[in-house]
From Swiss-Prot:
A Pfam short name: YjeF_N
Domain YjeF N-terminal intervals: 10-217
Function statement: Catalyzes the epimerization of the S- and R-forms of NAD(P)HX, a damaged form of NAD(P)H that is a result of enzymatic or heat-dependent hydration. This is a prerequisite for the S-specific NAD(P)H-hydrate dehydratase to allow the repair of both epimers of NAD(P)HX.
Designated name of the protein: NAD(P)H-hydrate epimerase
GO cellular component terms, A-Z: mitochondrion
Record-listed (6S)-NADPHX binding positions: N60, N61, G62, G63, D64, G129, F130, S131, F132, K133, P134, P135, D158
One GO MF term: NAD(P)HX epimerase activity
Cofactor descriptive note: Binds 1 potassium ion per subunit.
Family the UniProt entry places it in: Belongs to the NnrE/AIBP family.
Entry cofactors: K(+)
Keyword NADP annotated: yes
HAMAP family according to UniProt: NADHX_epimerase
Amino acid sequence: MLKYLNQSEAINVDLELFNEYKFSVDQLMELAGLSCAHAVAKCFPAKDFARVLVCCGPGNNGGDGLVCARHLALMGYTPAIYYPKPTPKPLYENLAHQCQRMEICSITECPRVEEAADSYDLIVDALFGFSFKPPVRADFVSVVELLQQTKLPIASVDIPSGWDVEQGKLNDCDLEPTLLISLTAPKLCAKHFKGKHHFLGGRFVPPALQRKYELNLPAYPGNELCLEL
């Protein structure tokens, strides 16, 4: 049976990928963001959902979002990035620079619900990952409110923003994405997901690590970078 990770297990799996298996952060981020773009493309074809607002947070989840936006642009989408609190580290600065040089639009103010409905077909939620602890910081209140109030479909990267990594949706969080892309392995909160599509992405987990944590990940078909659970 597929294992759903608690917060400490998710952290430890990441640490082992970095320390024992010598993956770099940017290496895993590139693979994760690419798999997210592929999952989005499977569920929301560019011919119908070309205009994508990618909302990026300050950590690794936001980095995944920046990578996803770049690959979506290469797949025929027209992404725009909302990145309210850029991380002042070379990795994130380089990812943002790559998006800029790819001529991906970056917006400085969070759109209101009506503006988003007029301007976009889909929102990618890459705000917070499995290390999130409430409450939501002031810089992100407006975008979390947009995610909770919009009628646009939402694709959440690894964890729907504002959810508890283990308990799922909290009392003050109404976010219910249409697509959840669990990275590496699903987290416990994914058991509470009621949206239409749940995908697994991040095809980089070594067999020995799978066995150690008894992840029981399903086999990815052929050369696919993501699979629907």
